[in-house]
C-alpha cells in the first residue's frame, strides 16, 4: 500500500480522488477527468475549511455543471426528494410564511423543486441559475428564471427574501457571496439557506465530507462570522431535521449593532494534526482488514479509499435504492444496496457516514455482522 496523501501544518492534500459529479450506468468515461487531486486549508478568521482548486480543477467543476449531469439532492434524479428534500422545503415554507415577502428569489434553483413546492402553497419565487438544466426545467414547469450567475448587481436591492439550498458550501469566496446577498436585499430583508454541517468532522479530523464541489466545510461559528461580517443581524443557526445540515436565517437591519466577540473560535485550529492521526489510523486498518472490507455510504468512504489508492477494489453500499447498480465516476465498481448484503464469516464493514452511523450499524448487525467487525471514523 502506498500513502497517497500529505498533511502539512496548514493544509491537507489527497493526490488523487474520484471527481464525483454524476451517477452513471457504466464505467464509461466523459470529457471530464474522473479523478483529480484535492487540497484544503483553513480560513481561521472565519473558522472554516476551504478547498483550494487549481485552474484545471475549477474548469472541471464548471464543465460538470454545464454538462447537465450534475445531481443535486433536490433534483428529480437524486432519490432524495422525499427525505432530505422534504425537510428543507418545510424549513423554507416556515420562513416564507413567517415573513410574507413580496419578492422572493432562490439562488441555484436547479429543477425548481423548492419553487414548485412553495408555489403549491401560494407563494411565487423567481429562480436564479445559469445552467441549461435549470432552463429546461423552468420551461417544463413554468416558473420564472433568471438564467445567469448570481452577483450583487443582478437583483441589487430588489429582494425581500433570498434563499438557497446546497449552495453555500459550493461557493468560492463565500464571504464575498454573503456580502452580495446582503446588497441584493431590501432593508429588513431575509436570507435563509440550508448547508452542510461539518462541525463534527472538523472536531475529529475526519475527511469523509471532502468533495471537489464542496469547496467549504462549515462550523456553527463560521456561519455566524461570515454573515455578521457581511452585515447581517438576527442570525439563527439550527440543525436541520434530516441529515447533517444547518438551517440558517439572517436579516438585513443596518440599525442593529452586531456583536460577534463572544463567538467561540478555533474549531478548525488543530484540524490538520487530527486529520494526520485519522489517516494514519485508516492506513493501519486498511492494511489489516481494508482489502477485504466492504464500505457503507459511497461518498463518505471514497475520500478514505483514495488515500490508499483504492479506486474500485472494494464493494460500496448505500441505502438509496435509486443508486443501486450505478457507478460514481472514478470508481470501478457499481454501488450495491441493502438487498445485496450477505453475511460473510470474518467479513467486515467500514461506515463512512457519521450522520447515519448508528442506523447503519443496526442494519449490519441485523444482517449478522458482529459489532466487532463494524468499523468507522469513530473507531480509527
Language-model-detected regions and their locations in the chain:
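Conserved N-terminal segment of class I S-adenosyl-L-methionine
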Residues: 2-165, 246, 253-289, 302-303
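Conserved SAM-binding loop
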Residues: 87-205, 217-235, 250, 303, ...
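Acceptor-substrate binding/catalytic loop of class I
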Residues: 27-35, 206-221
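Hydrophobic, well-ordered beta-alpha structural blocks that scaffold small-molecule cofactor pockets
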Residues: 247-380
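Short beta-strand->alpha-helix junction loop in the catalytic core
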Residues: 197, 244, 380
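Conserved S-adenosyl-L-methionine
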Residues: 13-14, 232-243
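General small-molecule cofactor/ligand-binding pocket signal
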Residues: 146, 236-238, 336, 374-375
Amino acid at each position: 500500500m502506498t500513502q497517497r496523501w500529505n498533511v502539512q501544518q496548514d493544509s491537507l492534500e489527497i493526490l488523487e480522488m474520484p471527481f464525483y459529479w454524476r451517477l452513471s450506468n457504466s464505467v464509461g468515461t466523459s470529457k471530464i477527468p474522473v479523478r483529480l487531486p484535492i487540497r484544503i486549508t483553513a480560513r481561521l478568521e472565519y473558522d472554516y475549511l476551504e478547498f483550494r482548486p487549481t485552474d484545471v480543477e475549477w474548469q472541471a467543476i464548471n464543465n460538470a455543471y454545464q454538462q447537465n449531469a450534475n445531481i443535486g439532492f433536490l433534483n428529480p434524479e437524486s432519490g432524495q426528494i422525499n427525505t432530505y428534500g422534504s425537510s428543507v422545503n418545510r424549513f423554507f415554507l416556515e420562513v416564507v410564511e413567517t415573513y410574507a415577502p413580496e419578492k422572493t428569489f432562490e439562488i441555484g434553483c436547479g429543477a425548481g423543486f423548492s419553487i414548485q413546492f412553495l408555489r403549491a402553497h401560494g407563494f411565487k419565487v423567481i429562480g436564479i441559475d445559469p445552467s441549461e438544466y435549470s432552463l429546461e426545467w423552468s420551461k417544463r414547469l413554468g416558473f420564472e428564471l433568471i438564467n445567469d450567475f448570481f452577483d450583487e448587481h443582478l437583483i441589487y436591492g430588489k429582494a425581500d427574501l433570498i434563499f438557497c439550498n446546497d449552495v453555500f458550501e459550493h461557493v468560492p469566496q463565500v464571504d464575498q457571496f454573503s456580502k452580495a446577498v446582503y446588497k441584493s436585499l431590501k432593508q429588513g430583508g431575509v436570507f435563509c439557506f440550508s448547508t452542510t454541517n461539518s462541525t463534527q468532522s472538523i472536531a475529529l479530523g475526519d475527511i469523509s465530507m471532502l468533495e471537489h464541489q464542496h469547496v467549504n466545510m462549515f462550523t456553527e461559528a463560521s456561519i455566524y462570522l461570515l454573515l455578521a461580517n457581511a452585515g447581517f443581524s438576527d442570525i439563527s443557526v439550527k440543525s436541520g431535521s434530516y441529515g447533517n445540515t444547518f438551517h440558517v436565517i439572517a436579516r438585513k437591519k443596518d440599525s442593529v449593532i452586531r456583536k460577534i466577540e463572544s463567538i467561540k473560535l478555533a474549531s478548525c485550529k488543530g484540524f490538520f494534526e487530527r486529520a494526520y492521526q485519522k489517516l494514519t489510523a485508516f492506513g493501519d486498518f486498511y492494511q489489516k482488514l481494508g482489502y477485504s472490507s466492504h464500505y457503507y455510504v459511497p461518498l463518505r468512504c471514497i475520500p478514505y479509499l483514495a488515500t490508499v489508492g483504492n479506486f474500485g477494489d472494494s464493494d460500496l453500499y448505500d441505502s438509496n435504492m435509486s443508486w443501486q447498480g450505478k457507478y460514481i465516476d472514478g470508481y470501478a465498481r457499481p454501488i450495491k444496496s441493502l438487498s445485496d448484503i450477505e453475511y460473510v464469516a470474518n467479513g467486515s464493514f467500514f461506515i463512512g457516514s457519521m450522520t447515519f452511523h448508528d442506523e447503519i450499524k443496526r442494519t449490519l448487525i441485523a444482517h449478522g455482522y458482529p459489532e466487532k467487525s463494524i468499523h468507522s471514523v469513530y473507531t480509527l
